[in-house]
From Swiss-Prot:
Stretch list, region Linker 12: 262-284
Region listing for Disordered, in residue ranges: 1-40
GO cellular component terms attached to this protein's record: intermediate filament
Residues the UniProt record annotates as site (Stutter): 365
Similarity-based family: Belongs to the intermediate filament family.
Name listed for the protein in its UniProt record: Keratin, type I cytoskeletal 50 kDa
GO molecular function list: structural molecule activity
Organism: Carassius auratus (Goldfish)
Spans through the membrane: none
Subunit architecture: Heterotetramer of two type I and two type II keratins.
Pfam families: Filament
Location of the region described as Coil 2 in the Swiss-Prot/TrEMBL record: 285-423
Residue ranges of domain IF rod in the record: 116-427
Amino acid sequence: MTSFSRQSFMSSGGGIGGSSMRGPSMGSMSRSSGIGGGGGGHISAMRAGSVYGGAGGHGVRISTGTRTFASGGGGGGGASYGFGGGSGGGGGFGYGSGAGGGFGGGDMDAKVNVSEKATMQNLNDRLATYLEKVHSLEKANGDLELKIRQFLENKTSPDARDYSAYHATISDLQDMIQDATRINGGVYLAIDNAKLATDDFKTKYENELAMRQSVEADIAGLKRLLDELTLARSDLEMQIEGLKEELIYLKKNHEEELASMRSQMTGTVNVEVDAAPQEDLSRVMAEIREQYEGVSAKNQRELDAWFQTKSETLTKEVTANTETLQVSKTEVTELRRTLQGLEIELQSELSKKRSLEGTLADTESRYSIQLTQLQARVTSLEEQIVHLRGDMDRQSQEYQMLLDIKTRLEMEIAEYRRLLDGGATSFSTSGGGGGGGGGVVSSTKTITVKTIEEDIVDGKVVSSTTK
């Protein structure tokens, strides 16, 4: 914040005896007086300068008042006062007066008293306006201090902050987080149960697969055995057919031999000799035939019994293996159906898991965004508090500066009043005397106004200009 102050110096020249006095730093005042003597006196060009400035030291204006008085005679005297003052609060006033008298004779301007009254009235009006402005600024400053104090108490005091709305939002968010945590816990538990069930079914599937492979290996072995038995049966059937053909061939040869022997016996001559009786060939052949037929029948029965036994055994084994194969096929079908159902359930659980993971990620992202927004809001509020504290410090400095200005202005006003009281007394007691036979003595006083402009930044004078 930059403030400007103007200082005015008025010096008096001419006459007999002169004095100058410099006032406080925010304004200036000068006093000059002169007494002239002679046959006649003339007092003219008496000026009183005034300086006042607007708020903050800007818009500085210098006002001057001129009073001219003349008197003729053997002697004369005069006095002049000038005051000027200005402050950053915005106010200023000026006053100038002059009086003279002589013995030699002359005339006085009749308007002096009226002009002095008008000047005093103007001075009083300006002083009243300035005081009103000071009171209004004090009141506004008090209101601002009260507002700042209330704002800081409401915003910066930990006990005075109202977090009820935030508490409700935080409670809702905590409830939502707890619900999501419970849901996630249930989902994790369901996933673990599904994993355990999947592992159990996988173990069962591996066991059933091993059993199936074992049953398929047994079935393959039984099929090979069945093929071997089928080949053995075919071989036996071929042997039976060969034996039947051989039996038929033997029967045919036997019949041919019998026929040949009968034909030979019919053409022979019976010669009886005294010898031992021969055996009956027919009976022998019949016995041989019976013996061979018995052996053949026995072999056939044994073959039939063996074939029947083997057939029954193979049939039983094939039936048992067929039933086992059918049961195994049924079990394999059931296991396949169960495996397909488990795979479908596993896919659904995996899809559910992915969906829940996506929901969890979305929830975390949404809560992260909300948390970021809340943190940004907290940061913004903290920055506002810092700015408010800076504004409070700045306004406190401005208030202190205005208070100092007010104090100095009050001191200047008191000094002005004291000088005005002293000036009024000197006016009432001043006079001039002299003698002469008609000569004229004139005295002229010139008041020079000097204005000093200073640029003040943070209480330090940056530049100074004298006009």
